[in-house]
Amino acid sequence: MKLDELAAIRRDLHQIPELGFQEYKTQAYLLNHLAKHPEGRIEIEKWRTGLFVKVKGTAPEKILAYRADMDGLSIREDTGYSFSSVHQDRMHACGHDFHMTIALGIIDHFVRHPVKQDLLFLFQPAEEGPGGAEPMLESDLFKKWEPSMITALHIAPELPVGTIGTKSGLLFANTSELVIELEGKGGHAAYPHLAEDMVVAASSLVTQMQSIVARNVDPLDSAVITIGTITGGSAQNIIAQEARLEGTIRTLSPASMEQVKKRIEAMVRGLETAYQCSGKVSYPAAYYQVCNSSDLVEDFMQFVSENGLAEVVRSKEAMTGEDFGYMLKKYPGFMFWLGVDSPYGLHHAKLQPKEEALETAVRVMTAYFSSKAN
């Protein structure tokens, strides 16, 4: 598939971003494209709003898998593209339009150039939330088509086109959503001594939590606690009865994640005493770390470099989260960054990845799978 064909698909998908488990138009678009392939070369199974697509090998003994996430984000696009999102306040701001396009390009190649082994392509919904990888792994289809290895990529705005980046072991952090709900006794702004101010309580808690990383996490490890939103109160002259804090926790080890959560919960218990309120801590979604299989990823990097398929750089661990980690927890495999050279980063309303990177990714993955599946 040539670059202009890949770009056309990407632009179509870019216009129809949908949130997790709402990817109905996206699924329909993918099915329509896949229907163009000769009957008998591929098998397609729907799974919720996602797809399992198997490209049949000539004499299969195993299955090699590739995963592409599908969902968009709740962001109002500001790219100025002529092919901007037609869904208000929805955008493919994390490159999932790229990821799906690349998967379609790889499928197209192997339909026309069969290899010995079966290739399984997973179009996974809800990576951005509430998380599609775990329920997809638990589906009967994964039992039917169990892979011997699994791979994925993610666009990297900071890397130039023609470059990929990855590493052995830990690549992406453990991540967890965080919600804290506080409830006390509201009242009139003129009588603070008769009320329990949850805005003040929430502010105090945010300040306290800044000490957790500095004093409760191993200095040789890393962790980030970010409170992204605080809501509370209803009017300027009413002391807030309730407050809600939402954020994320990110750590480079499961042990640090457990420690951070314990400290947050202890601080909330202390807050209940100090401010005579009640507090509830919850973690609506959590993603396991992305940990690459060292032997497979080292072999992949060597293969790409020796064959001149792309420039290869060794990445550092990133605090980004990815539910692909659950797939790597169960199956050998790896993930890598794909350079797309955008002046704006992931989850930015002006993210503008260069489409030439589509060709790089398809070239790399078709060559790699050809070497491993024959």
Curated annotation (Swiss-Prot):
It catalyses: N-acetyl-(2S,6S)-2,6-diaminopimelate + H2O = (2S,6S)-2,6-diaminopimelate + acetate. InterPro entries: AcetylDAP_deacetylase, Amidohydrolase, Bact_exopeptidase_dim_dom, Peptidase_M20, Peptidase_M20_dimer. The active site is at D69, E128 (proton acceptor). Gene3D superfamilies: 3.30.70.360, Zn peptidases. Pathway: Amino-acid biosynthesis; L-lysine biosynthesis via DAP pathway; LL-2,6-diaminopimelate from (S)-tetrahydrodipicolinate (acetylase route): step 3/3. The keyword Metal-binding does not apply. Keywords: Amino-acid biosynthesis, Diaminopimelate biosynthesis, Hydrolase, Lysine biosynthesis. GO terms for biological process: diaminopimelate biosynthetic process; lysine biosynthetic process via diaminopimelate. GO terms for molecular function: N-acetyldiaminopimelate deacetylase activity. Its EC number is 3.5.1.47. PANTHER family: N-ACETYLDIAMINOPIMELATE DEACETYLASE (PTHR11014:SF98), PEPTIDASE M20 FAMILY MEMBER (PTHR11014). Belongs to the peptidase M20A family. N-acetyldiaminopimelate deacetylase subfamily. Catalyzes the conversion of N-acetyl-diaminopimelate to diaminopimelate and acetate. This is N-acetyldiaminopimelate deacetylase.
